[in-house]
Amino acid sequence: MARRENGVQASEDKQGLGKSRQAGLCADTIIMTMDGELPARDIAPGDRIITRDAGMAVLLGVRRKRLRCDAIQIKAGSLGHKRPPEDVILPAGTQILIRDWRARALYASAQKLVPVQDLQDGEFVTLLPAQDLDIVEFIFDTPHVIYAGGLEIGCQTND
């Protein structure tokens, strides 16, 4: 069953990859903030993050952890013109906003938040072997879509 967050339809994991459910961003992922582009590792509560849905949101909290999880690699330019601008690695459960032919073809929707693992095609969006990643999760008062690594990434609340 799908749910709606800030007017964007979000999907639920149907693949049940277990440890793949981990979401977040790798610590070196570049985030768009009101102070410019910063790596996720340098962002702290109180920072103002640029969002697709609200323009700007104040970050309430940050979770940092190192763990072993499945990861997805998205090759540069594979999700649109310069989207992402360079190869990006994300934990497999990270929600990504798609709003192109993929959303229409796969979900009959103009835009949709989906776990990045659901976009695997074996060539441009590929599953990497489980690996140790430094993960950063952002916590907001309401769900938001942020700009991270040249992609639009869904961030949740502290539920």
Regions found by a protein language model. Name each.
Residues M1-P39, G150, T157-D159:
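Protein maturation boundaries and topogenic segments
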Residues R41-R48:
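Structural motif
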Residues C26-T33, I50-M56, L60-D159:
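Long beta-strand-rich cores associated with HINT superfamily self-processing modules
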Residues P39-A40, V58:
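A sequence-level detector of short linear motifs
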